[in-house]
Amino acid sequence: MSTRRRTLLKVIILGDSGVGKTSLMNQYVNNKFSQQYKATIGADFVTKELQIDDRLVTLQIWDTAGQERFQSLGVAFYRGADCCVLVYDVNHLKSFESLDNWHNEFLTRASPRDPMAFPFILLGNKVDIDGGNSRVVSEKKAREWCAEKGNIVYFETSAKEDYNVDDSFLCITKLALANERDQDIYFQPDTGSVPEQRGGCAC
């Protein structure tokens, strides 16, 4: 019986403090949500094992503190990432306006071989608050931002209600796997092919 290949994927989650990055991770990995807010200091990661088709995947999800003083965590933290997840709070305009900075921060620090093809995904979190009546960033506005950045995949989520959490992380895993395959192709000798630009997620 052949041994199935196990793949380690590194995913980095970026966004302002308080947008729910840690809550999304905990809901996905531990099926838990806490009402108490505790700021992440520096960086931390959790792992989750899953199977995609015939691949055994270990998803290593890195959570960063969103405070400005922790924004530059160092090149080593970003390098080797297979996917970058950007998170904002649909009820907090500043967290949406900060997305450009986080997007640029990642590209500058991680220096992906093909920035236009590198997989990003955007999560608009906390859609459950006040039944959606408190939101200040529309889905249309978020999707327009994604289109400007090369058709980034977008999900609206609620860590508290476990809304779209599993679906979004499954998509993240598939995007990361696709990026890993593109990197394998890139390093093959005598190839003139360029990794295809992302357009969506076959979730």
UniProtKB/Swiss-Prot annotation:
Renumbered ranges of motif Effector region: 37-45
Membrane topology: Lipid-anchor
Ranges that cross the membrane: none
Lipidation (S-geranylgeranyl cysteine): 201, 203
Expressing tissues: Expressed in xylem cells of inflorescence stems.
GO molecular function: GTP binding; GTPase activity
Subunit (UniProt): Interacts with VPS39.
Function: Intracellular vesicle trafficking and protein transport. Functions in autophagy. Involved in xylem and tracheary element differentiation.
Note: Plants silencing RABG3B display a significant decrease in the number of both protoxylem and metaxylem cells in the basal region of inflorescence stems.
Protein name: Ras-related protein RABG3b
Naturally occurring in which organism (per UniProt): Arabidopsis thaliana
